[in-house]
Structures are given as C-alpha cells and as structure tokens.
C-alpha cells in the first residue's frame, strides 16, 4: 500500500508518525466527478464488473423506462440513484447484478413536440421519422445526466421501446394474447381527451378541481297511469297538474344524449305535491331539494325504486325541438346514492360507464346509443339546437334552453374534483367509441382463470416494499374496467390487423399475419406498416380488407418489456431459464414511484398474466415523490423546483446520492437548500473519517504487517468486533432495500464510535509508538479491516468517494481497478468479541462521565486540554473490574495524563475526581508526566517517548 504514499517531511527533533495521504480533505466533487465518470467510461467499468461476475447467480432489477422527452428532474434522479444503489449493494454480495437502462419512446408527448416544431398535417411516415429522431436526441441528453449521477449500467446498449426488434416483439406479444382470447373489439365509454384526440389509459388521468354548472332538471311524466299505480294513488289525482321526475347533474352537456333514468331499487321515493306540480324525489332528499327550488311541498305517497322500473318520462328538450321527442325509461341501479342531488340519476350511455352498463344490461343495442360528441369535443352538426358547439361552450346554452322549456328547477356553479388529461391538464370525458380491449373478465380460450383472477393471484405471490403497496395494487386490479388497448395516434406501435370492410371482423389468419408484419417491422420499424400494401400479404383478399389504423397504448409498450427486452433484445444479459419454473420470475425487482401502481407495475402485471399466467416480478418497491422543505409538491409555478443538474454542478452528484440514501424513500422525500447543507455536513464527517483512516495506513502493507487477532490489543479487538456487528446490520438493511438506516448507522459509527472514541484513543499509539512496533501495527491491522468494511458499506451510495478512496487503499491488489468487482469484506473473527462489546460499552459509559467532568473543570479555567488532568474514579461491581483490567492503559482511554481506580463505597455511585497535573508537559506526546526530563540528553520528553524513540519501546496491553 505504500507505493504512491508520501510522509510529511519531519522537522522536529522528536518526530511522531504523522503521515499524509493523497485523499484530500476537500472532495471538490463538482470538478472531479465528471473526470471519474469519463474514466469509468474509458475503462468500460460496467463490462469489467460483468466479467468479474460471469457465471454467478443473476439479480435482475428491470428498469422502468423514463419517457424520452425533456431534461431529467429531481424525481428521475431519486429513481435512478435508488436503482443504482440496489444494483451495487446486490453486486457486492457476489451476485451478477445486471442493469440495462431503458427509455419509453412512443406516444403523445413526442407527437406534440413534432407538431410544435413542424406544424400539423404531416404525413404519418414523416411524423414517425421525425419522432424517432427527436426521441434519439432526448435519450442522449438524459443518458448524460444519468451517468453524471454515478449510475453504472449498460449505457452503450440500453433498451428502447422504439428499437425495431422491440416494436416487432410487441406485435408478437399482441398476437399471443389475442390467440389466448383476451382481446376483443367493442363500443364502450373510455377516457377521452379532446386535445389528444384519443382514448387515455387509467394511468393517464389525473384529478383536479373544476367549476361546472350544476343543474336540477325535470323529466315530464309520460306514463301517468303507471306512476299512479306505483305510488298507489288515484290516476285522477295526478291528471290535473304537471309532473316531473327530477335529476341532478354536473354535466349539462350530456342532457341531449339522455336515454334513461336510474333509481335505486330499495330507496324510498316520494311523490311530492308542490305549487309547480308533482315531483318525484328520493324521500330523504325532499326537504333539502325543495329548499333549493324555493318550493313548498307535501309528500302525497312513497314507493320503492323497484316499483317504478321501466316507467317512461319525456325528454326535457322534447318541447323545444322534434329531435328530442323520445322517452327515457327508469332502470334500476345499486350505484345510485342519496348523499347529494335528488336520488335519481340521468343516464347518457355514450358518456358514462355505469350508464352504458345499465343500458346494455337492459338490451340497448350499440346502434341505438346516441353519441353526438365528436373526437374534438364538438357536437355533430346534426344535433338539434346545439350542433357545432363545443360541449363546454354549450353548457350555458343548454341551461338556458331548459329554462325556456319550463323543465329547469335549479342551476348554480359547483366546484368538484374532475378528470383531466395528465399531459394537457385539460378536462376529459367518458366517450363511447369503438376500441380494442383486453378483457378483465372474459374467459380465455383454455377456460382457465380470467385476467382479473390471474392478476389478483399474482399480487398475493409478490413481495411489496413498503407492504401497503400490496393492498393498493389489489384494489386497483379488483375494480378496474377492461383495458383499452387502442389509441388513435401516429407515433406508436400499430395494432396491425386487417379488418373486413363490411363485417368489421378480423382476418381469420390474424396471428399468422401479425407475425409477417412483425418480421417487416424488425427490419424497417413501425414505418413498415404505413408503407405495406395489403396485397403483399393478402393477395386477392386485399380488396375485402382494410388496415386498422389504431396504435397500441404506450403502457402496452413499457408493460411488455419483460417480453420484448428480458426475453427479447437483452436476453443474453437479463434472462435466466429459472424464470420459466412455476415459481420463477423474469425480474427480481421492479422499482418506481408510487404512481406506478396504476402505471407500469399495473400494465406489466396484466401483460405478464396474459402471456405467462404469473407476474413478471418477484418484488415491487415503491418510492415517494419529492417535495420541498415545507412538504409542498414541486412546481415550476410555485418556484420550488430543485434541479439535479444544479446540485451536481454546485455541490456534487455525491450529495444527491447521499440525500437519497439518507431519506426514507417509502414516504415523501423532502429537499431544500437547508436539507442539502445538512447532507453536505454529514458527507464531510464521513470523508474526514476516511481521510484519517487512509493517512494512518499510508505505511501499512497488509501482506507484510498483518497480525492474527489474538495479538492485537484489546481495544483493537473491540473495534473490529464492533465493526463486525455493524456489518451484519448493514447487510441486513441492504437485503431489505433499506438505505437510510445504513447512512444513519455509518454516520454514527464515524462520529461516535470512531471519531468520538476509538480513533481519539488511538491517536497516541499511532503517533507516538515506534513505527514498526506491534502496538502500532496492531492498531493499523484494526484500521485496515475497518476501512475495508466501511468502503464496501458506503460504495452503493457514496460511489464516487468509495472509488476515490479505493484507488488509494487497494493499490496493487487484485481488485485495484474498482471496488465493485470485490465483495463485502470478510471481517476477521474476534473470539472474545461478545465479551468485549459488553465490557467496552461499560468503559465508554464511564468515559462519557469523565469527559463531562473534565469539561466542567476546563470551563472553570483550571485545565486547558484533558491531558493536563489526572483523574481518580471510584466505581463498583463489573465497572470497577473493567476499569481495573486496563491498568495503566486507562489513562490513554480517558485522554488524561494519569488515571487511578478505587472501589466505591458499598452501594455508592460512580464518582470522578479531576485534579490538574503538577508535572511537566512532554514536548512530544503532550502528556504531563513525572518522568519528563529523566534523561538529561532529552530533557523535554517523557520516559515513554524516550523509550519509543531511542529504546525498546513502551509496552501496551489494552489500549
């Protein structure tokens, strides 16, 4: 270890062993980290690690791909650093911990960028070409930032969902799930964004407050006789006055599409006589609603909802235009509530999931469903009264027309939580369109369990970190609708079907044709579908079929990467045949933010359940979102965002890594300037400890100077036993993917166990005993083992610093290039370790009390440093025995010039007496001793220093 070390030039007549190290006190991280990243790239560090682990058991953390658009933000940094720490921690156990980074490349955000740059209306092929080029540029930018964070991985060969092979294999996955009977086409209300012009996945929907017009609308009685019968009142009583069943809604724009009314079968409904006419309302809502309508009223009769089933009412706009002359029947629904509104729900099956299900359950054919809202949010021109208006602009006009009709009972502004597109931040609607779905509850062709059943069983077989994620994902799968696979976009993997022009049926050879298209895509990308002439595959049948123009949901892109990447493009690196065993999984771990329970975790579970009948992962790990120091969500408008690039340039990426590691990622991760300042202070403590260790190992060569543990001094054996105990805790935390306890314990170890005790005691022996004495070499043995262990503990999160120190520490050894080809250090066993841990715990407790008493005397001005003092300790029991066993070495433990132990009176407490020393100070060791000047040739040093410099050297037994 001494090849590139240097000792400070000694000027003193009585030198001490003060050594230097190339490991600087200041990390200078912003300047030096980029140099290290370049070195790692130049020497292909990741490949060296893979070569070192060749043949070892694999550990696969499959990367959830970030989207290839824009610079990385602090959330990206958290995610990538967490993954990197886990990969490195697992790799240091000897596993072949592979990391292939990936990117999600298709989809709407990139299409939007192409529109912004080049305008709308480009040919599809040109959009795809420009989108591919744009994504490539974005990936290069993001990759540079990820590598800057010290993240090691196969950056030269990442997976991209837009790679031709991945696009082709995605089509093959679609073919497989079709063959197994999960895919169908149908008319259903789906989340629809007018700005996207496309259906949205559940994961693409967010909720924000929105102010809408809330209206109470009356549907006039159409079958008065049936109403009289249901409420058991004479028909004549109802015939003299008008009557309405009243609904409440916050979506006036759906009224033109009303086709039914929903009532709860078991709720009591009231027939209320008012000056305006008869009203039907839920009995529990009568008082509240009449106040709202400014009406007095009397309940004439009541009836349960099921008594009114199939009774019909006139459409409220029938008087205003003949196009609305129709009636709406009452259908029963358990989902109707009486918490708010009237207890009656108006049903527009084209624009509500429950509305649609209710109408379909009552036999309404798809062709009868009224759906006037077009994909851009504008009513079809053929819609009476409101054609050509956007639905949002139509709302106030609809209210006005209802008022004119005499059927409006109330309208007011109403704030509520409403669905928005996560990209455009604009309101979305449910809209019935013809789409391709993966059925959650359809029977697969093998008559096995449904997709929902398979996925729920898979959740039970998955580990969750933290544990609450299990119930969250379970609830989402248990309650989700069918998965809308199709999108009406251009930059996406095509649903490459041939559809019969007249019947709409798929070509009978669809699985075979999908494989043919996949082969073309493998060579030319998804662009091949655009240029494909159906005749090339269908021959004479081409005239009867047309190409489907839908693309696959981008969540299907990333959700099938276990198929397209682990089994496909990166099979050699990632695939383990054991994954195909009944309990096998393709990945050990998926790790993402908590939003991915409804995103990537979710889509990956569904696709794997359809393809293999089990999850793709053994475990799911979830981290929280970043917030500022006050717990507020990061927002550009608030101005509280924190840029990882800025932190790296000002403080160093190591500080980001340490912040991530020191934060409990299972909750929100707070970050601010003040928090980062504390992280920097913690980093300096660790770095200073490392510097001390490395400096005092400068002249140590383990091959020459190693000693068996039995020949070390007692305090050295204690320190190594303490290190061994901590290592067991550290490795246990790493196994459970816990980092913040490791950081906390490492910092405590550095500041209290080492800096506050062991190294403090050790300085005298390291500096003053003979350089090659057993006392000093024994101390260096302990320091060597502690440093080995410590560097491995910190390497997963303090990667730059651990590697920097390792280059100095491991110079000339087998793993000199990188700490990451080695494994966690096997700390030598200390036979009496448990006994020493207990004994020295008691000694340290006494030392803390002595230090407190010394400080009190120092504050009084009676002493300067603790070496100016002599102490007498009165103690009893095991404490007395422990202190007495140290003999004269006790003074070195207490950092005093003399220490004496006496038995305490029976039952007496520990008593510490501090006395200023009356002796002279040794120029060399600074102890105040009676024998200073005993050798006239060296009148300024003590007998111990005289012996260490010119004689046989002092004897140490314990410390």
From Swiss-Prot:
InterPro entries: aa-tRNA-synth_I_CS, aa-tRNA-synth_Ia, Anticodon_Ile_BEm, Ile-tRNA-ligase, Ile-tRNA-ligase_type1, Ile-tRNA_ligase, M/V/L/I-tRNA-synth_anticd-bd, Rossmann-like_a/b/a_fold. Keywords: Aminoacyl-tRNA synthetase, ATP-binding, Cytoplasm, Ligase, Metal-binding, Nucleotide-binding, Protein biosynthesis, Zinc. Binds 1 zinc ion per subunit. It is found in: Cytoplasm. CDD domains: Anticodon_Ia_Ile_BEm, IleRS_core. One of its GO terms (cellular component) is cytosol. Zn(2+) binds at residues 922, 925, 942, 945. Gene3D superfamilies: 1.10.730.20, HUPs, Valyl/Leucyl/Isoleucyl-tRNA synthetase, editing domain. Its cofactor is Zn(2+). A motif ('KMSKS' region) lies at residues 633-637. The keyword Nucleotide-binding applies. Its EC number is 6.1.1.5. L-isoleucyl-5'-AMP binds at residue 592. Transmembrane segments: none annotated. Pfam families: Anticodon_1, tRNA-synt_1, zf-FPG_IleRS. GO terms for molecular function: aminoacyl-tRNA deacylase activity; ATP binding; isoleucine-tRNA ligase activity; tRNA binding; zinc ion binding. One of its GO terms (biological process) is isoleucyl-tRNA aminoacylation. A motif ('HIGH' region) lies at residues 66-76. ATP binds at residue 636. It catalyses: tRNA(Ile) + L-isoleucine + ATP = L-isoleucyl-tRNA(Ile) + AMP + diphosphate. Catalyzes the attachment of isoleucine to tRNA(Ile). As IleRS can inadvertently accommodate and process structurally similar amino acids such as valine, to avoid such errors it has two additional distinct tRNA(Ile)-dependent editing activities. One activity is designated as 'pretransfer' editing and involves the hydrolysis of activated Val-AMP. The other activity is designated 'posttransfer' editing and involves deacylation of mischarged Val-tRNA(Ile). IleRS has two distinct active sites: one for aminoacylation and one for editing. The misactivated valine is translocated from the active site to the editing site, which sterically excludes the correctly activated isoleucine. The single editing site contains two valyl binding pockets, one specific for each substrate (Val-AMP or Val-tRNA(Ile)). Monomer. Belongs to the class-I aminoacyl-tRNA synthetase family. IleS type 1 subfamily. This is Isoleucine--tRNA ligase. It comes from Cupriavidus metallidurans (strain ATCC 43123 / DSM 2839 / NBRC 102507 / CH34) (Ralstonia metallidurans). The gene is ileS.
């Amino acid at each position: 270890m001494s090849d590139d070390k240097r000792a400070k030039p000694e000027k003193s007549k009585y030198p001490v062993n003060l050594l230097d190290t190339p490991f600087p006190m200041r990390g200078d991280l912003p300047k030096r980290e980029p140099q290290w990243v370049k070195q790692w790239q130049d020497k292909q560090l990741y490949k060296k690690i893979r070569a070192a682990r060749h043949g070892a058991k694999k550990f696969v953390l499959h990367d959830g791909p970030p989207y290839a658009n824009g610079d990385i933000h602090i959330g990206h940094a958290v995610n990538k650093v967490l993954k990197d720490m886990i990969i490195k921690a697992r790799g240091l156990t000897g596993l072949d911990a592979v990391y292939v980074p990936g990117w999600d490349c298709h989809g709407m955000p990139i299409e939007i960028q192409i529109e912004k740059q080049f305008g709308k209306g480009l040919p599809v092929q040109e959009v795809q070409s420009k989108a591919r080029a744009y994504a490539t540029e974005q990936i290069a930018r993001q990759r540079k930032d990820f590598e800057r964070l010290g993240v090691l991985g196969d950056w030269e060969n990442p997976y991209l969902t837009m790679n031709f092979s991945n696009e082709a294999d995605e089509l093959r996955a679609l073919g497989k799930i079709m063959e197994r009977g999960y895919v169908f086409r149908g008319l259903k209300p789906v989340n629809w964004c007018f700005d996207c012009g496309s259906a949205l996945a559940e994961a693409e929907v967010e909720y924000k407050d929105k102010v809408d017009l809330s209206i109470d609308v009356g549907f006039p009685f159409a079958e008065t006789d049936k109403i009289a019968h249901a409420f058991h009142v004479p028909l004549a009583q109802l015939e003299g006055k008008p009557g309405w069943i009243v609904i409440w809604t916050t979506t006036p724009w759906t009224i033109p599409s009303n086709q039914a009314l929903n009532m709860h079968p078991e709720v009591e409904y009231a027939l209320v006589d008012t000056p305006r006419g008869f009203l039907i309302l839920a009995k529990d809502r009568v008082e509240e609603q009449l106040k709202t309508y400014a009406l007095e009223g009397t309940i004439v009769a009541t009836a349960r909802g099921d008594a009114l089933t199939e009774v019909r009412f006139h459409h409220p706009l029938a008087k205003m235009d003949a196009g609305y002359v129709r009636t709406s029947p009452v259908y029963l629904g358990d989902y109707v509530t009486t918490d708010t509104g009237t207890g009656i729900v108006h049903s527009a099956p084209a624009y509500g999931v429950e509305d649609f299900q209710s109408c379909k359950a009552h036999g309404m054919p798809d062709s009868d469903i009224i759906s006037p809202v077009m994909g851009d949010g504008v009513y079809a021109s053929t819609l009476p009264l409101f054609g050509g208006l956007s639905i949002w602009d139509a709302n106030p006009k609809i209210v006005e027309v209802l008022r004119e009709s005499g059927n409006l009972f109330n309208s007011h502004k109403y704030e509520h939580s409403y669905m928005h597109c996560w990209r455009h931040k604009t309101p979305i609607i449910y809209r019935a369109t013809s789409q391709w779905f993966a059925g959650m509850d359809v029977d697969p062709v093998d008559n096995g369990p449904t997709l929902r059943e398979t996925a729920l069983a898979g959740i039970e077989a998955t580990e969750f970190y933290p544990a609450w994620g299990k119930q969250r994902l379970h609830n989402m799968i248990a309650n989700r609708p069918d998965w809308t696979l199709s999108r009406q976009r251009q930059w996406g993997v095509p649903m490459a079907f041939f559809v019969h022009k007249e019947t709409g049926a798929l070509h009978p050879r669809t699985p075979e044709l999908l494989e043919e298209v996949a082969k073309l895509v493998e060579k030319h990308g998804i662009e091949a579908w655009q240029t494909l002439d159906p005749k090339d595959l269908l021959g004479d049948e081409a005239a009867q079929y047309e190409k489907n123009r839908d693309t696959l949901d981008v969540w299907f892109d990333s959700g099938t990467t276990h198929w397209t990447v682990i089994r496909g493009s990166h099979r050699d690196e990632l695939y383990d045949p054991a994954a195909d065993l009944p309990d096998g999984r393709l990945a050990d771990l998926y790790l993402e933010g908590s939003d991915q329970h409804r995103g990537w975790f979710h889509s990956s579970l569904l696709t794997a359940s359809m393809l293999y009948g089990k999850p793709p992962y053994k475990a799911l790990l979830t981290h929280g979102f970043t917030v500022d120091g006050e717990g507020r969500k990061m927002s550009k408008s608030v101005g509280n965002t924190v840029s990882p690039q800025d932190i790296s340039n000002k403080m160093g990426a190591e500080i980001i890594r340490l912040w991530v590691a020191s934060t409990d990622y299972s909750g929100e991760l707070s970050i601010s300037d003040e928090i980062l300042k504390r992280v920097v202070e913690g980093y300096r403590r660790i770095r200073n400890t490392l510097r001390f260790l490395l400096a005092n190992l400068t002249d140590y060569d383990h091959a020459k100077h190693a000693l068996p543990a039995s020949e070390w001094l007692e305090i050295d054996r204690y320190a190594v036993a303490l290190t061994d105990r901590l290592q067991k805790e550290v490795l246990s935390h790493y196994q459970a993917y816990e980092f913040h306890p490791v950081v906390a314990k490492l910092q405590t170890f550095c500041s209290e166990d080492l800096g506050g005790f062991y190294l403090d005691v050790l300085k005298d022996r390291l500096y003053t005993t003979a350089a090659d004495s057993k006392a000093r070499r024994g101390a260096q043995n302990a320091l060597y083992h502690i440093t080995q262990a410590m560097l491995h503990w910190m390497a997963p999160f303090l990667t730059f610093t651990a590697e920097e120190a390792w280059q100095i520490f491991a110079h000339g050894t087998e793993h000199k290039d990188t700490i990451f080809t080695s494994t966690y250090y096997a700390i030598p066993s200390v036979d009496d370790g448990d006994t020493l841990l207990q004994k020295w715990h008691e000694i340290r407790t006494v030392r803390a009390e002595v230090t407190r008493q010394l400080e009190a005397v120092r504050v009084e001005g009676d002493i300067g440093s603790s070496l100016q003092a002599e102490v007498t300790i009165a103690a009893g029991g095991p404490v007395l025995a422990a202190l007495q066993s140290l003999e004269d070495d006790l003074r070195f433990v207490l950092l005093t010039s003399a220490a004496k132990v006496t038995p305490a009176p029976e039952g007496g407490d520990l008593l510490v007496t501090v006395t200023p020393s009356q002796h002279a100070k040794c120029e060399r060791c600074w102890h105040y001793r009676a024998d200073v000047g005993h050798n006239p040739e060296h009148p300024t040093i003590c007998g111990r220093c005289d012996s260490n410099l010119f004689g046989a050297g002092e004897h140490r037994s314990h410390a």
